[in-house]
Every structure is written in C-alpha cells, then in structure tokens.
C-alpha cells in the first residue's frame, strides 16, 4: 500500500475544519489532530488566554512551531487555526508536506456558526464581529487559495457529504483506488 499522505484543512473559523477533519480521519483510518488543541494542551491554557497574555504575535510564534512539527508527521488529518496561513513558513510547511484542502465559507455562515462561541479571541471583544470576519476574510482568503490543492464550499453541505466529496477528490488526485 502506498504511504499515506497528510491532509491539511485550512479555512476561516466556523468553516467546519474540526468537525469535517474528525470524520475524514475516521473514514480514512488516519489520526486527527487540531493544531489549536495541541497548543492548548502543551501550554495548559486556552487560546484566548494565550492571546490575552502574549498577544496575537506570541500566539502565532507558538502556532508556527507546532505546525512545523505536526506537518512532519505521517498519515494525519490536521485542522489548522484560521490564522495559521498568515505565516509564510506555515504556508510553505502545509503546501510542501501534504494535500491542502481549503474549506470555504461565507462571512454570513461564519457569523451564524461562531455567534455563541466564546473561544474565538479575535471576536470576543469586537463591537462588530461581522465586520471583523469580513476584514479577516479579505486578508486570509487569498492565502487559503494560494496553498489549496482542493477548495470546497461548506455552507450548504453537511459534514458527512463533505467527507465523501473529499475522499473522492483525493482518490481522483492520486489516481489510486482509495489509497492515500
């Protein structure tokens, strides 16, 4: 059997990276890793607290080290934080070490999905969260597109359908009947 390639999920907060990633990993019999969860586990603090204490720059440095480490593993489905693509190094690690799937969503759908989530540091204290999401999209969406091998809109699909689409697309990319 061919060596399994890593699958890296990128996209904005609320796109469904963690939900889809878990199901995708299960279907492909791969390990699922969420880079934000690894950062929280290693620091013993949640992302919001790290942002408060170290600022976004401090968090991004931690994130870069973790993504460098995780992308060197084999046979994983990795869900990245929405801002991981801001680092050129992260974009290089992701695009060189696996298949990058951009889970695309609209600002409106993001707003609906993140409205009650208190673990989104960039939205927590925002007077106008929708505007923050629009501003982030302007900066980040071109970076997601830059490194994506596959782009999939997530607004109208449920996770199971998305997972099946991803598996089919990867199979077609590889030309291997189901082997990653």
From Swiss-Prot:
Q: Tell me which residues bind Mg(2+).
A: 18
Q: Which residues bind ATP?
A: 14-19, 120, 157
Pathway assignment = Metabolic intermediate biosynthesis; chorismate biosynthesis; chorismate from D-erythrose 4-phosphate and phosphoenolpyruvate: step 5/7
As for subcellular location, the record says:
Cytoplasm
Please give the Gene Ontology molecular function terms for this protein: ATP binding; magnesium ion binding; shikimate kinase activity
Transmembrane ranges?
A: none
So what does this thing catalyse?
shikimate + ATP = 3-phosphoshikimate + ADP + H(+)
Disulfides per UniProt: none
The alphabetical list of record keywords is: Amino-acid biosynthesis, Aromatic amino acid biosynthesis, ATP-binding, Cytoplasm, Kinase, Magnesium, Metal-binding, Nucleotide-binding, Transferase
Tell me its family.
Belongs to the shikimate kinase family.
Q: How does it assemble?
A: Monomer.
Q: Mind telling me what this protein is named? A: Shikimate kinase
Query: Taxonomic lineage per UniProt?
Result: Bacteria, Pseudomonadati, Pseudomonadota, Gammaproteobacteria, Pasteurellales
């Amino acid at each position: 059997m061919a060596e399994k390639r890593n699958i890296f999920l990128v996209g904005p907060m609320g796109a469904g990276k963690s939900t889809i990633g878990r199901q995708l990993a299960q279907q492909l019999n791969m390990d699922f890793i969420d880079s934000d969860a690894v950062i929280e586990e290693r620091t013993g603090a949640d992302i919001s607290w790290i942002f408060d204490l170290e600022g976004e720059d401090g968090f991004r440095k931690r994130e870069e080290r973790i993504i460098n480490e995780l992308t060197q593993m084999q046979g994983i489905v990795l869900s990245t934080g929405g801002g991981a693509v801001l680092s050129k190094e992260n974009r290089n690690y992701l695009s060189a070490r696996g298949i990058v799937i951009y889970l695309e969503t609209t600002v409106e759908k993001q707003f609906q999905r993140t409205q009650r989530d208190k673990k989104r540091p960039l939205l927590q204290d925002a007077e106008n969260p929708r505007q923050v999401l629009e501003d982030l999209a302007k900066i980040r969406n071109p970076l997601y597109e830059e490194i994506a091998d596959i782009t999939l809109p997530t607004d109208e699909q449920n996770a199971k359908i998305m997972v099946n689409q991803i598996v089919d697309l990867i199979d077609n990319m590889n030309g291997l009947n189901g082997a990653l």
